[in-house]
């Protein structure tokens, strides 16, 4: 039996912030000979994305409870029980040595199913404040890790696993030394875009004129509107794309990033070594604010809560950063990154599987 490959089931779904770090760890362990399967839901992004990465996926039926009506909340225990039964049957077939919960609704019933079968549960919290599922699962987990300090008081801070092409970028001093001309501003609202960025940055461009050049990811369906907004203020020279497929190339091009502060975005920007203006999504637990705070505290970024994200404030901030200041900020961002996060998570999974 000892010669058989170890088996891991990754439980992650819903958003890229959960799925991409899970894929990074899965690929790392597969390269070491592990067998990996995925537990997800059929109607979210993991259903298409995970099989494209050569990983088999099993589905359970589960969705979030936040913001649902009374009827849905009353039905929740039965839905969770059914999802737990489905996950338990899947794990009985696959017989994983360990499960890795990377967040999303699927982790709840999946983690409970693993625990009920005596399978060790390893948790990774990507955000600076723990989600409800992970708060609950932490009570039964063998090990809990966190990307940023503060989500769990005693968990090891290991960073967020990020894509290898971002980690492979040249260091800031190598990449940015000798650059001149307009400051290159990369605007990223996530794959869905961000209306506040789409409305504000064309006006910022009008104020700053030829001192900046902008590459703006508008999000799905917004490219034409954003292009018109730039053209309407005489700034049609800037580049607007609906989606950026090669984020590593975009980071390599940029001098500074203006973006939301989802956990994976913050970790990628730190790993790339880039200054940033963060505009946290206004969630009631301020999750994105807490994600961005370590970089602001390190002197690598500036946080604008959405009401403060005005044309004047952003234009003044960008105008006030010299190339020397941007390089210093870039180096500070890189200094607080944890580039071996994938290895750290994979190593803990391996350790738990051996014990």
Swiss-Prot record:
Biological pathway: Cell wall biogenesis; peptidoglycan biosynthesis
GO cellular component, as recorded: plasma membrane
Record-listed UDP-N-acetyl-alpha-D-glucosamine binding positions: 15-17, 127, 163, 191, 244, 263-268, 288
E.C. numbers: 2.4.1.227
Gene name linked to the record: murG
NCBIfam families: murG
Protein known as: UDP-N-acetylglucosamine--N-acetylmuramyl-(pentapeptide) pyrophosphoryl-undecaprenol N-acetylglucosamine transferase
Organism annotation: Salmonella newport (strain SL254)
UniProt keyword annotation of Lipid metabolism present: no
Family designation: Belongs to the glycosyltransferase 28 family. MurG subfamily.
Enzyme type, top EC level: transferase
